[in-house]
Structures are given as structure tokens and as C-alpha cells.
């Protein structure tokens, strides 16, 4: 029996390599609301983690795929976390890789200022599409951006309007309370990459402590699905398999 994994990814984290999964898992991906091939709804000017999680739950339910294992990266990590909290019935187990929990950091303003300066420089250089490139080079590294397929780079850059004008600035305040996190019973793994910025480690440690799990490290950057796909799958495969 093949296991099902759904990937909940941030707009800047698409393009997860499928081959390392294909021997054992059926992998489902989707374009989040207003990104890539998912049309932007009329009048849609803001979003929330709750809306994003509701979308993912509705997809799994409509396709009769629940419960499924969930892998969430970056903004997708907090979407997956909200699935665990409000839609536990659609998730069999979850891997949360570097969820963007800015509000739990000791100095969230410093992190937001750094990211803001990167985005502002990109906007000044060429608007939202150029800002996407600046942002991904900052988050994932120059090598990762440079080796992406040109068509994928273009598609990701085209999401700049949604990323910067709808999503960014709305997700960063997301912070479930301790009691809510302690009530999660679905098996969950918290993951960080070895080459990522320290604030990802800080947020992961905060979350793992409240879920009563250990932080697991994987090689690579904020986007290990690009630079270390086989190592990423090797790291999380035993957990995704679950009990025999």
C-alpha cells in the first residue's frame, strides 16, 4: 500500500524534487490560493493562516485523500501547524520544516527589518518580480536560485504580487498558545536545516518544546527540497512511514 504525502509549500519553496519519494509515496502538490496556476479570487486582498489551512483541508476532503501525511515548509509550515490544530482529522502525521513563527522570536523586529530591507531593495530594482529573486537569494542562497529551471523561476517571480501584497505581513503574527500546542496529538516532527539562519533554530526550538518533541536537523538551506532533496527524504522517510 502506497503512502500519501501532501506538500504545503510557501510560494518561494515550490519545485520539490519528486524522484526521491516516488518509490514509496504518492505525493500531492497544489498551487496555493492566488499563486501560479491557482487564480486569484476577485476582491481577494488579504489572507490568513486560517484561510490557507482551510484551503488545504478542503482539498484533502474533496479529493477523499484524508488523512494524509503533511510536509510543510516555511509559510507552509505554519499552514500545516494550523491543520494540526483545527483540522486534525485530515492529517495522519506532519513534518514542519522551519515554520515562519516570527512572533515567538526574542527579537522579531530585527528579523523583519532584515527581510524588509531585502524586499525593498528588490522592489526598487524592478518591482515585485525582482523582489522575489532578491528574497529567494536571501532565504535559500544564490546557488539554489541560479540552478532552478528558468520556467520555474519565472513562475515564482510572477507570484511576487501575491507574496508581498497579500501574504507577507499577515502570516508573521501567527502564534498558537501553549495550551493549544500541547493539545496536538498527531505525530509531528520539527525540522531545521543546518545552513539556515539562527532565527529558524530559535523558532523550531520554541515549537518543539511545546510539542514535547526533539528538533531534527537536515542538511541544506531553508529550501532543502532544492539543494539536498535526497538527504531531506532520507531524514524524514522513517517518520513519514509511521508504525508498520
Predicted regions and their residues:
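Conserved serine/cysteine hydrolase catalytic core
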Residues: 155-211, 216-220
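Conserved hydrolase catalytic core segment
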Residues: 66-108
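Conserved HGGG/HGGXW glycine-rich cap/lid loop of the alpha/beta-hydrolase fold
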Residues: 1-40, 45, 59, 238
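Catalytic active-site module of serine/aspartate enzymes centered on a nucleophile-bearing elbow/loop
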Residues: 210-244
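Conserved catalytic-core motifs of eukaryotic protein kinase domains, centered on the activation segment
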Residues: 38-44, 106-107, 201-202
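Short beta-to-alpha linker loops that shape the active-site pocket of alpha/beta-hydrolase fold enzymes
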Residues: 31-35, 100, 219-221
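Conserved acidic catalytic loop of the alpha/beta-hydrolase fold
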Residues: 50-68
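Helix-rich cap/lid subdomain of alpha/beta-hydrolase
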Residues: 99-154, 168-170
